[in-house]
UniProtKB/Swiss-Prot annotation:
Classification lineage: Bacteria, Pseudomonadati, Pseudomonadota, Gammaproteobacteria, Pseudomonadales
Name of this chain's protein: 4-hydroxy-3-methylbut-2-enyl diphosphate reductase
Co-factor(s): [4Fe-4S] cluster
The gene coding this protein: ispH
Residues holding (2E)-4-hydroxy-3-methylbut-2-enyl diphosphate: H41, H74, H124, T168, S226, S227, N228, S270
NCBIfam families: ispH_lytB, PRK01045.1-2, PRK01045.1-4
GO biological process: dimethylallyl diphosphate biosynthetic process; isopentenyl diphosphate biosynthetic process, methylerythritol 4-phosphate pathway; terpenoid biosynthetic process
Cofactor binding comment, as recorded: Binds 1 [4Fe-4S] cluster per subunit.
Signal sequence, renumbered to the chain: none
HAMAP family assigned to the protein according to its UniProt record, in alphabetical order: IspH
Keywords (A to Z) from UniProt: 4Fe-4S, Iron, Iron-sulfur, Isoprene biosynthesis, Metal-binding, Oxidoreductase
Binding site for isopentenyl diphosphate: H41, H74, H124, S226, S227, N228, S270
Amino acid sequence: MQIKLANPRGFCAGVDRAIEIVNRALEVFGPPIYVRHEVVHNKFVVEDLRSRGAIFVEELDQVPDDVIVIFSAHGVSQAVRQEAAGRGLKVFDATCPLVTKVHIEVAKYSRDGRECILIGHEGHPEVEGTMGQYDASNGGAIYLVEDEEDVARLQVRDPDNLAFVTQTTLSMDDTSRVIDALRTRFPNIGGPRKDDICYATQNRQDAVKQLAGECDVVLVVGSPNSSNSNRLRELAERMGTPAYLIDGAEDMQRGWFDQAARIGITAGASAPEVLVRGVIDQLKAWGATGAEELDGRPENITFSMPKELRVRSLI
């Protein structure tokens, strides 16, 4: 068995920044540091931060007064921000800047009284945060669609005053079809020059397509609640390659590889490289050889830290 590694894979700039915000807050202020929602959707990362003093909660009413709170990389609604401000909580915002870009778009549509359609997965925290940027008091509304069927059923107030945005971690292929359906149904709809799917999601999806074309089995390292990791598994399967989403080496079954000569490995944007290395080690223990890195698109993007953490971490 030969191992092939997708490139790029694993952590993106937004995830790096979010994890570093929690780490630096723990270093500068000491535990406990409260984090609203899992800072990124990866069990290994969350458990590591929890062991160092991070406390993960789903709502701010679980947070005591006079503590530090971090908003997760997925972003939060305006209502959550207002609740935190009203309580005087010290907040560090780990929202991915590319998610914030979508928030700004939605807020502008709201101010302009323009109805907005969000393409995304119901119940995902990023979707909840993005929907929560829209203030319907200006007379508009925001709608959520996931697929072409949702578009066909959608009833809007003013089809000539519409715009769309997208969740950042969707399948590019699926989203393109939904956008086409929106433009067909609502010819005057506006939107971003390109969809809002982030560079890292696009790069990892392109890489897994290449990987699936060269391998007999694909392993996607990522947690079950990770949207972008699930999309990677789906893309590999659509290319006719068996694919498995695993948190780590302990989730693998030897029988998956009985007929496999080439095993591909990738990782979602919230999965650390240490988990990939653990998978490689286990496969080698089962007789696999090598670990060839495929050619891929280089990523050199970084996002800045909040100023207070940047400065105080140097003291």
